[in-house]
Curated annotation (Swiss-Prot):
Annotated protein name in UniProt: Inactive PGL/p-HBAD biosynthesis glycosyltransferase BCG_2979c
Species lineage: Bacteria, Bacillati, Actinomycetota, Actinomycetes, Mycobacteriales
Bias type Basic and acidic residues, positions: 295-311
Domain of life, per lineage: Bacteria
Family: Belongs to the UDP-glycosyltransferase family.
Organism: Mycobacterium bovis (strain BCG / Pasteur 1173P2)
Region (Disordered) location: 1-23, 295-366
Length: 366
């Protein structure tokens, strides 16, 4: 029997028919996120780079801004890159070693102008910055939510102390007198380092962050710590401060030509100072490792000098892929700053880990 429809009855095929002029469903706009890395050291570039690369491009429109000095290590970028200026790494590290202001008012003023230009051009929904202190001003002036990436060592709620730095004063006056003066004057030294950013914040109508240097390095609408609480414990963290965990990265490079010539019958120690490690520390590290590089039975060192194998970066997992290989690394700049900056820090010892933790220690803070 032929089916018919009556008034008020849509009929069996009505639900599957489409009106020719029906408007298509609106496609959800991708969130636009700008990642900004401060290229004073490699760590502050690769951490936002790794996070940016981890986002689903079908859901997020990602932009990446940094000084291009480390781009050759990053490889092809899967998103637009926007070059911004960062003061030379050597200049920043020298100022830190000398206890001088690493970012003065003039530098931060230039940074803020560059930030505002790129924020206006991209108009992101969120900006994520790693050690780009000027975003504390520029993002707020643009009305854009700001997520700061930092090390938990810098958290105002971190359970840690600031050790005496290895500075020339200790050679002239002795460790004990300088230690006493350091404990007395450290809060004042830290306060001096807060002056440039606080002055610029007030100039732009923003409130001061106070005189705790830890607040300067962790200010953000949200703050993500690239650490785990077991490494740097904290107490009473604000709701907008979270542990992100280690951000792992390594350059995609081939192993050096000598890698497969290393002995397989003895443990291997892979030492890396990171991009912020002082070159003068390399021999200190090698001397300290001397007892590990001796053959216990024959009492001699490995024949090939360690210096001939220095200066090359290894792909993540390569050292750990060798049986009995351990990693020894120097902390990244953010771990050093409370120690070295303002004459407020020391020569940090490396972290030694068993084989399975090698990649994390090697690349958690390049």
């Amino acid at each position: 029997m032929e089916e018919t429809s009556v008034a008020g009855d849509p009929g069996p095929d009505a639900g599957t028919s489409t009106a020719p002029n029906a408007a298509p469903e609106p496609v959800a706009r991708r969130q636009r996120i700008l990642f900004v890395g401060e290229a004073a050291t490699l760590a502050h570039v690769v951490r936002p780079f790794v996070l940016a690369r981890s986002l689903d491009p079908s859901r997020y429109e990602v932009h990446f801004a940094c000084d291009p000095r480390f781009n050759k290590l990053l490889g092809p970028l899967p998103f637009p890159h926007h070059p911004i200026h960062t003061v030379p790494s050597e200049e920043v590290l020298l100022k830190i070693a000398q206890g001088r202001l690493f970012y003065n008012t003039r530098t931060l003023r230039k940074y803020i102008a560059a930030d505002r230009k790129i924020l206006n051009e991209i108009a992101p929904d969120v900006v994520v910055g790693d050690n780009r202190l000027s975003l504390s001003v520029s993002a707020r002036l643009a009305g854009i939510p700001y997520i700061a990436i930092a090390n938990a060592y810098w958290s105002p709620q971190a359970r840690r102390r600031f050790p005496l730095p290895d500075v020339p004063w200790t050679r002239f006056f002795g460790v004990r007198p300088v230690s006493i003066l350091y404990r007395l004057y450290r809060p004042l030294i830290f306060a001096l380092y807060c002056l440039p950013l606080n002055w610029l914040r007030r100039k732009h109508g923003l409130s001061s962050l106070g005189w705790d240097l830890c607040r300067i390095f962790t200010d953000g609408d949200y703050t993500l710590y690239a650490d785990v609480p077991e490494l740097v414990p904290t107490y009473n963290l604000p709701a907008n401060h979270r542990y992100l965990g280690p951000v792992l990265w390594s350059p995609d490079v081939k192993p050096p030509t000598w890698w497969h010539s290393l002995p397989t019958d003895r443990p291997i120690i892979y030492a890396t100072l990171g991009s912020s490690g002082g070159k003068n520390l390399l021999q200190v590290v090698l001397n300290a490792l001397g007892r590990f590089t001796r053959d216990g039975d024959r009492g001699h060192r490995w024949p090939e000098p360690p210096e001939e194998r220095a200066g090359q970066r290894l792909r993540r997992g390569l050292p750990a892929g060798r049986s009995g290989c351990s990693a020894l690394r120097r902390g990244a700049l953010q771990r050093r700053q409370p120690d070295d900056a303002a004459g407020v820090g020391g020569r940090g010892a490396g972290d030694r880990a068993p084989q399975q933790h090698g990649p994390a220690l090697e690349h958690g803070g390049p």
